[in-house]
A protein has these predicted regions:
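Short, structured beta-strand/loop micro-motifs enriched in basic residues and often containing a Trp
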Residues: 99-108, 234-243, 357-365
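Short, solvent-exposed loop/turn elements at beta->coil junctions and helix N-caps
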Residues: 214, 365-371
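Hot-dog-fold acyl-thioester-processing enzymes
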Residues: 2-106, 176-177, 181-197, 280-360
């Protein structure tokens, strides 16, 4: 380590443990903000938006989604900048070595109690750690841990979040796979180009009757193995097509499927088979209904420019890399990409849809890898990995994995309290 390197490291070390005065949310939590979050995520949990149902439930009234904890104190699009905040000081030191791009890559949440409309939160942040320089798929950079305790303005603790961010040098990013705009969708094989084709409508449901993994090469721009399958559709039609957006371990004969339409670069529409969105439970599971190794049905989620922007704004995250393609490219990304609060929100919805509307998320951990870019599909799947007795019920641990064409996007784990 050179003298300048040692000085650089010493400047970073001097900031570890630095704390800030509390940052107060601009507004108290409102039902309107919760409803906008639900609209962006596609979450229909009545605990978040049905006052009559919520009043008669274990919640006793509307509650906010658990993973929204750290969004309420975000500064929004017009930051009232407080000079010399600890994170700003770390970023200033890192910027002297070219580490100017940022991405949130990991969070750990612990929840003390549910958040409710009217709660006005304060964030008490401190710098937990700054890593040595690392090589990542985004480029070379440093991981910075921001530890935040959250309390109401009356001083009541409601939770803690450890947020890990990567500050990387965009000039060090190596060339990777092509963007979704350069991705050619595979046609169904074989193709009778001259024959007229009546496509089944998108959304047509059915049952997979057979599937296989062909011997020829998969799409080199998609990390997922290539599968084809045959299904019996709801109207009795037999239909064969690519099985899309699903890893082979998630595909089995007899599973429900739905027809989706995939558009190629030249404007063709190709029908594919994929998994439907899992049905949301209207009653809450009990611990007796759950076993270790139990799998959650997969949920393929289209990633679009609209969904990325909607999730970012609904979670008060106006970082330009989620909203402005030019800014994202300038900072070394291939396009705008989904924010960590958005990815966490989708996982939160996936878990509570499976567990039921009175299930309580006790803690939540998530790590991001490959970014979610427009034109891709991110498929969530999960498995129960732990069961522990708790007061009045069972604490269930569920591990969730979200994959897209670039590989793993999100690896998450949550503890859920069931009756």
């Amino acid at each position: 380590m050179t003298g300048s390197d040692a000085d650089f490291r010493a400047r970073l070390d001097a900031l570890i443990g630095l704390t800030d005065p509390p940052r107060r949310a601009k507004d108290a939590i409102t039902e309107a903000a919760i409803r906008i979050w639900c609209d962006a995520v596609g979450d229909e949990n009545p605990a978040y938006q049905d006052p009559r149902w919520a009043a008669g439930s274990v919640w006793g009234g509307i509650v906010a989604p658990a993973t929204s904890l750290n969004m309420w104190t975000l500064p929004g699009n017009r930051r009232a900048h407080r000079h010399a905040e600890s994170l700003d000081r770390v970023n200033e030191v890192l910027a002297t070595r070219g580490f100017t791009s940022v991405a949130a890559v990991q969070t750990e949440h612990t929840y003390v109690r549910p958040l409710r409309p009217g709660d006005h939160l304060e964030q008490f942040p401190s710098i937990g750690a700054v890593s040595p320089e690392k090589s990542t798929r985004l480029g070379r950079g440093h991981f910075v841990d921001l530890v935040s305790d959250y309390r109401t303005v009356e001083g009541e603790p409601v939770g803690r979040v450890v947020l890990r961010m990567l500050r990387w040098n965009p000039a060090t990013r190596t060339e990777g796979p092509a963007t979704s705009g350069d991705r050619l969708a595979r046609p169904v094989r074989p193709v009778a180009a001259a024959a007229p084709i009546d496509l089944p409508p998108a959304g047509t449901t059915g049952t997979l009757t057979a599937h296989l993994q062909p011997g020829y090469a998969a799409d080199p721009l998609d990390e997922r193995p290539y599968l084809v399958g045959s299904a019996e559709l709801a109207d009795g039609t037999r239909f064969s097509a690519d099985v899309a957006y699903l890893r082979p371990d998630l595909v089995h004969d007899g599973m429900p499927v739905v027809v989706a339409h995939r558009r190629t670069r030249d404007g063709q529409i190709l029908p594919v088979l994929t998994a439907p969105r899992p049905q949301r439970r209207t009653s809450t599971r009990t611990g007796a209904e759950v076993s270790i190794g139990q799998r959650l049905a997969p949920w393929p989620i289209p990633v679009t420019q609209l969904s990325i922007a909607a999730l970012a704004t609904a979670t008060f995250d106006f970082n330009d890399v989620h909203l402005d393609r030019d800014a994202a490219l300038e900072r070394g990304a291939r396009d705008v990409y989904m924010n960590i609060l958005g990815s966490s929100a989708l996982v939160n919805c996936y878990l509570t849809d499976w567990a039921g509307p009175e299930a309580r998320v006790v803690d939540f951990r998530t790590r991001l890898a490959a970014q979610n870019h427009p034109g891709d599909t991110c498929t969530l799947d999960g498995v129960v990995t732990g069961l522990n007795p708790a007061d009045g019920g069972t604490h269930v641990t569920v591990d969730v994995r979200g994959t897209n064409s670039l590989g793993d996007h999100v690896i998450a784990s949550a503890t859920i309290a069931l009756p």
